Swiss-Prot record:
UniProt keyword terms in alphabetical order: Asthma, Cytoplasm, Cytoplasmic vesicle, Guanine-nucleotide releasing factor, Phosphoprotein, Protein transport, Transport
Domain notes: The FXDXF motif mediates interaction the AP-2 complex.
Native source species: Homo sapiens
Positions where Phosphotyrosine occurs in the chain: 520
Short name of any one Pfam family annotated for the protein: dDENN
Places the protein is found: Cytoplasm, Cytosol; Cytoplasmic vesicle, Clathrin-coated vesicle
Record protein name field: DENN domain-containing protein 1B
Compositionally biased intervals (Basic residues): 639-651
Highest classification ranks of the organism: Eukaryota, Metazoa, Chordata, Craniata, Vertebrata
Amino acid sequence: MDCRTKANPDRTFDLVLKVKCHASENEDPVVLWKFPEDFGDQEILQSVPKFCFPFDVERVSQNQVGQHFTFVLTDIESKQRFGFCRLTSGGTICLCILSYLPWFEVYYKLLNTLADYLAKELENDLNETLRSLYNHPVPKANTPVNLSVNQEIFIACEQVLKDQPALVPHSYFIAPDVTGLPTIPESRNLTEYFVAVDVNNMLQLYASMLHERRIVIISSKLSTLTACIHGSAALLYPMYWQHIYIPVLPPHLLDYCCAPMPYLIGIHSSLIERVKNKSLEDVVMLNVDTNTLESPFSDLNNLPSDVVSALKNKLKKQSTATGDGVARAFLRAQAALFGSYRDALRYKPGEPITFCEESFVKHRSSVMKQFLETAINLQLFKQFIDGRLAKLNAGRGFSDVFEEEITSGGFCGGNPRSYQQWVHTVKKGGALFNTAMTKATPAVRTAYKFAKNHAKLGLKEVKSKLKHKENEEDYGTCSSSVQYTPVYKLHNEKGGNSEKRKLAQARLKRPLKSLDGALYDDEDDDDIERASKLSSEDGEEASAYLYESDDSVETRVKTPYSGEMDLLGEILDTLSTHSSDQGKLAAAKSLDFFRSMDDIDYKPTNKSNAPSENNLAFLCGGSGDQAEWNLGQDDSALHGKHLPPSPRKRVSSSGLTDSLFILKEENSNKHLGADNVSDPTSGLDFQLTSPEVSQTDKGKTEKRETLSQISDDLLIPGLGRHSSTFVPWEKEGKEAKETSEDIGLLHEVVSLCHMTSDFQQSLNISDKNTNGNQT
């Protein structure tokens, strides 16, 4: 029970009694009058009159006349039913209203009206007023209610009363909002409690209630006594006292003080001698008349000192004495002590939300941890958590001043905005959890799988480097022969090497894609269409996420490099790859990697070579047969030498690098001759005559595409680009444009090769003629 009051009572009150007390305690009180007259619950009719005179009637004085007090009965559902009483006629007559509504001020005022009717002997008016209120629906909070003699009850705002003076009622009240914080002086209970008890005793009583002790409060004034009980219990909000709760104990129930379980009981001072004769042990006793508190425990010292000092300073301020200052000061203390319960809520798909006690207790200071270890065993805290979980699992959610105080005070470790969104979606039936767990976008799932595989591969890379370092120390191996495991691999390495070789051979035997976009293999066409669909569904989130880690990838794959750059040697190494010695091949998990990262390339290369960023960029922007040929292959290394850093980091010299790459490549391929180069006018479907020539022409095309991609990389990569820009296997309209660009590049390369060959032949002829002349 997170709340002891009934949520939706059927009516404003259940019973009204007029009870007379005899001069002798041995005689039971007698019911003189009741409303409604047909009320038939005999148990209530027998027990309520005994609560109407909770004192020693033989010793009571005349000063009890006109006092209001409230007792509480608990029904079979553990809900509290309040008995609002007013003593009249020298304390021998008591008017009592029984209701589930904790409207203290309203019913105290109504009791005064009823006492006035009885004093004037206006029984007809009394019955008419009660009948109207009894049959009227329960008014909503903050709604004005007007009681008029000989008229039905009507609900109206203050403006209506001003416009129609004839409707001025005999009694008027506003239905209180019991969900808000009590205020001073509007709340009679809190006002009397704050005035009667000093701050130190309030703190001691608060600490004892948090430890669920057996507590007795004593006073000679019934109104002050019950006000202190109700007021102190209200300061536990959002928690409620879960044990024996008797605001004022009648003489026939004094044995309850000997109960072994926790209780909160108010006793009139005329009965205190009888209580002390029962030899009470481990009882916290507060005497309101003398403002003293006796306790065998040091409960206040068990609370965190910072929480206690802040609460004490707040209560001593003059500004706290009015409004909700007192209630809010205790609410803030409750939030500081228990507000971190949010961080201990746990949810698993298909299971109800639960509360983890271990997570709630850990990571706190020693004093706070010690208190929370005790608090998790308290009934008031357990019922509070059960109530919160019940609302969450029912999809209702909750939002009250306690949750607002936690958020504003920062008493939980989570993000307040995420918590508010969480509660908001829980009100809709837990849609956020279902969406997050079962309807995640492909980009989110891809990022999750990538991060998981990346972590595993990172560990393997560290192990590989450590093993290589040991081998270098033992055998003196050259650093250029190190085989580095690529950081980004889109294949599953659990498969065997034989399976990967089969896949590599299958790719090498695959027919080339013609420049007009037609594929010769139906299976490849199906695979590409499925891959393109996946890539378009993933969206741009994964691209942005993966691009953030691009620099870290470059750092991890960077190999030691010393000496001057040998661009010609590097280009020759790039062109000297052999189809018989391919790297590990596998299908890519997501095509977002090709769209979002410039440094990832799946190119068939030698195992013994180190990765280079110059040959990593061209696949992302390439198209045609080369991009199709290299799909899904491993870029683990280029053998021999290490290539220079990424061209993207040398913006100022990019133009010089372009021309240098082209000249070096042309010079390195002079020995092939003009006969090995396809005629640029021979059409689009030209054929490569030998593996070496194929590698040469392919290298030229690759280099040209790489240089084109470098210029794109100088812009902000991965931002503002269309998703299809980096997909080399897209067909239809866009491929025609890309094909024309490739044709232009091929024409330039082939023409340049022809010019170089002709120039070389002319040089050879001139050299021969010169030698002949000299001879």
